[in-house]
From Swiss-Prot:
The protein, known as: Probable DNA-directed RNA polymerase II subunit RPB11
Lineage, uppermost ranks: Eukaryota, Metazoa, Ecdysozoa, Nematoda, Chromadorea
Gene3D superfamilies, per database record: RNA polymerase, RBP11-like subunit
GO molecular function: DNA binding; DNA-directed RNA polymerase activity; protein dimerization activity
Biological process (GO), any one: transcription by RNA polymerase II
HAMAP family: RNApol_arch_Rpo11
Gene name in the database record: rpb-11
The keyword Transcription appears for this protein: yes
Amino acid sequence: MNAPAAFESFLLLDDKKFYIEKDTKVPNAAIFTIMKEDHTLGNMLKIQLLKDPEVLFAGYKNPHPLEHKILLRIQTTNNTTPADALTTAITDLVGELSLLEHRIDAAIKKCTQSGDQERGYN
């Protein structure tokens, strides 16, 4: 079979995880290559970046289904850099995911407690 081995989709051998390339076609833009990632991270970052008023453009693509990397293109205003916008987006995403985790844990705890009460375990 011509497909790469399954472990190649997540195991980062001697390669870097992250590359930055200045985009010379448009002002104040950069292309970030993130290795061993897919649409899950790409779409979350794109949506979070587009919430920032300093970001003029944010988009990503997976060059080929058998290549496990995403290319994230960011263009910002002159007030910030693409790297700063990405850092802010990642920080905001971590906060949102922490809040989601807390809410899920609270809901599970509430369900298990109500289930225990219905069964007469308390």
